[in-house]
Amino acid sequence: MKRSSFDAGLDGRQQDRRHSAVPDERPTPLKISKARACAECKRHKIRCEFRPGETSCTKCLRSGIKCVVNDFSQKFVDDDGVWKARASATIQQLQAAVSHLLRQNGLPELSTYTVGDSPNGPSPAAPSYHTGNRHSMNGSPSDVKPDGPGLVVTREPSQEPDLQDRELVPAPMRSLYEVTKLRDLRHNHIEQPKSTLLEEDFLSRGLISLQEAEELFAYFSRTMNQLLWGGIILVHRDLTSVRRASSLLAAAVLTVAALHIPNRTETLNLCYSEYVSLVSSMSLTRAHTLDDVRALCVGAFWLSELSWKLSGHAVRIATELGLHQSYQKMIRGHSDQYERAQLWYLLYVCDHHFSIAYGRPPVIHEDQAIKNYETFLQAPMVVPGDIRLLAQVALFMILTEAYRTFGSDTEQALTEEDFGQLRVFNVAIDQWRLLWQPRSEYLTLAAADSPYVRTYPSKGVVLHYHFAKFQLNSLSLRALSPTNTPVFSMDRKESANIAISSAMACLNMVLEEQDIRDAIVGVPIFTHTMVTFSALFLLKVAVNWNSAYLSLDSGLVRSLVERVIELLNCVSAGERHLTRHIARGLSKMLERFDSWDMSNGVPAGTVGERAGSGVPGGANAMAQGFPPPDLIYDMVGTYGFGLDENLLDPSMANFEYLAQ
């Protein structure tokens, strides 16, 4: 009687050998059967034999039927071998492609990159933010076009939502992303500058020469950049640094510089086209940097035809980057948030330059950062430019509140009850000057080493004061006409006269203060708005309202406007600079003013001296020398919060719409 292997102790020895060869923690590998019996032999349960060189077994050959082998295990082994061969070839192709890219970019060989052995490390399918989320403007995911139309929604291969997250009530969209992990819903992060951007920008393509680009950058750095709050908008010291940080910022700086230098029209056209192209291409991308926001602000401050749209786009990107939260983080001790909070204040002013002046509601409201600007000024890293910047923040807070109180409806006249609130805003602006003008004296000393700026910081505060008073008090004439307006009340007349004197003070400062005269070409277009707005208002008031209504010397108005035109014609700037268009437009307005003056048989410049003893108002208006209705210059768009946006549009070079 044969003994079983168990009785003979063979089974125990075999198990010992298996345990010694295979560690306990590793599973026993599966044994794949090599049986190749065909279906016919399996059905008859007979031995399936193959002769050498034959593809059918002997049973199937004798029966004359097709020999079919149903060995799924063997099929799995064969298919697995094919898949591995293909995967190996694909990996080799990827390695070759990566090695080529590394050589092209001057980076170390692929073999120098090691994979960590930590089981908790990131897998190749789930790269971390720093290694898998760097995209330049030209190489971002949004720039890659799909093969066909349709929405492509992808999911992040990241961890599941953390139920222990300390932020119990996050933003709704953040909660949606936390659950779905859809990339399209993710809050944007700040992207690191791409190290190879220098070799890919428009200067490397030879759009303009590097020497000319260096000249333009140097001009911008010592002029416009210093005028705009002491250079806080451009933190880079050389062109190479700007190019590595943002091609958009480089294009913006060179475009603005070329606009301000005579005989650079061809360069301006090239840089402007590149800038517009880059802005368009980045409008739907998700990868942005602080320098991209600065680039949009540079364009908004000096490119009048794009200013409104660029400022709005800059604010939207800034909120995606979380700049509106930087102030709170800074006061909690995160000093690295200073630059981001500073940029948020700059965006507030930029937004209000092109909203309040045009009678549009601003995008940025008065949040804690805006209201507590004095706390920001106490930070140790604050520079003199911050004081200049926050002076405008404080002023626009007052004007914004006035805008919300009185609105921008050009057909809504102020009631007598409104003048009480108007006086409150006048007092607030007076207090603003008392607070910030002494501070600006310190800024003048700080800017003494800049031959281009000189005393502009302190004089600029006074200029903004006069313009704010003019803009606010000009509301007293809104929706009024000399043909159907009764006698002015004392409050309305007082407010209108303040508007007139403030507008004349604006023009006088530009003409008489040497440092403002010298800087007028390089200041942001909001200052040009002040000048144009004031001149246009005075010309139209001189025609619509005679001296019996208001304290206005039309001869002095004509002289002031004529001198402003001469100043703008003499500035050194490119042919497409805004001052050229303003000068041409005001010249046409002055011609119309003189034509109307002469048509009434009165020498030019003496409008205010006639009919001074008449009683103004109502049907008696025509008897006092008022122009007939078809010659009355429309006052809409020349006061308060209703400036006509076409006023600064270079495409409207003849300014005929100003004299409809």
Swiss-Prot record:
One of its GO terms (molecular function) is DNA-binding transcription factor activity, RNA polymerase II-specific. It holds the Pfam family Zn_clus. Residues 1-28, 112-163 are annotated as: Disordered. The keyword Nucleus applies. CDD domains: fungal_TF_MHR, GAL4. One of its GO terms (biological process) is DNA-templated transcription. Signal peptide: none annotated. Its main location: nucleus. Keywords: DNA-binding, Metal-binding, Nucleus, Transcription, Transcription regulation, Zinc. Residues 38-67 bind DNA. Residues 130-141 have a biased composition (Polar residues). Residues 13-28 have a biased composition (Basic and acidic residues). The keyword Metal-binding applies. SUPFAM superfamilies: Zn2/Cys6 DNA-binding domain. GO terms for cellular component: nucleus. It is found in: Nucleus. Belongs to the prtT family. Transcription factor required for protein utilization and degradation. Regulates transcription of major secreted proteases. This is Transcriptional activator of proteases prtT. It comes from Emericella nidulans (strain FGSC A4 / ATCC 38163 / CBS 112.46 / NRRL 194 / M139).
